[in-house]
Amino acid sequence: MGFFSFVQEIAMDLGTANTIIISDDKIVVDEPSVVALDRHTDKMIAVGSKAKMMYEKTHDNIRTVRPLRDGVIADFSACEQMMRGLIKMVHRGSRLFSPSLRMVIGVPSGSTEVELRAVRDSAEHADGRDVYLIFEPMAAAIGIGIDVEAPEGNMIVDIGGGSTEIAVISLGGIVSNNSIRTAGDDLTADIQEYMSRQHNVKVSERMAERIKIAVGSALTDLGDEAPYDYIVHGPNRITALPMEVPVCYQEIAHCLDKTVAKIENAVLSALENTPPELYADIVKNGIWLAGGGALLRGLDRRLEEKINIPFHIAEDPLHSVAKGAGIALKNVDRFTFLMR
């Protein structure tokens, strides 16, 4: 990239939990989708991990915002500021001016026209000149290394923070899809509610997330893969005295059961709407899991036992969508499924 390069190409996975930006085939930004704003002027104070550190710790003059909810933009102004702040990280200190941007952005396959317009407008306000949108399951498939233009059926289950995207892909298009607003954030909320109800301990969203990462599971028997118990510190809900509660993966598996069952049912529903020829391909190729939710212990095994089709976890599930958007960026003229 030259000093006087006027156009910069970036691919973005604009997620509810994290935003990932790829430029020149490299992941240059991988930050939480959080922005901290001055409550009086609405000016941005911090973005990404710096803003996440302030989350749930602010005073009256600062508000921290997660601009996306359920995979779509919930706060347009905050999203625009967040995108601008994260894009600045891409060309930090390397130029005298900001270049105009050619962008490919991943969006949920269940997005309405209004939601797609909101993403495009945010990108254009953040200096995007050529903005292309790609449905997240399609981007994930490309990122995993699947030939999406082949006359063959492949199924992707992309479990993000705000939505789960399930799609059957063949010949460069989405044949059937199911987008549900049940995903990683719901698992975190389940843990928060469970800790309060079962152990009388108040835990923040961030603490619930740490519990999910440490002992989250979709199965009550993980065998040799079982994690150690996690010690939770927090105030007693009734007395406000400090508590120390050990939590094991089996109880978390029980507390996540209903949300995981919703994801199972969504996969079954997408399979019901799949043409028989493509269904046969999926049984042969297996189903691919991508997104942060794919990292939930035992999820692949649980889905396999329920659905009787092999499940594979993507090599790098957190970055599959961003990597796929990056490959699409290089093939803008060839990939007809990109939306302008």
PLM regions and their residue ranges:
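Nucleotide/phosphate-binding catalytic cleft detector across ATP-hydrolyzing
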Residues: 1-159, 167-287, 294-340
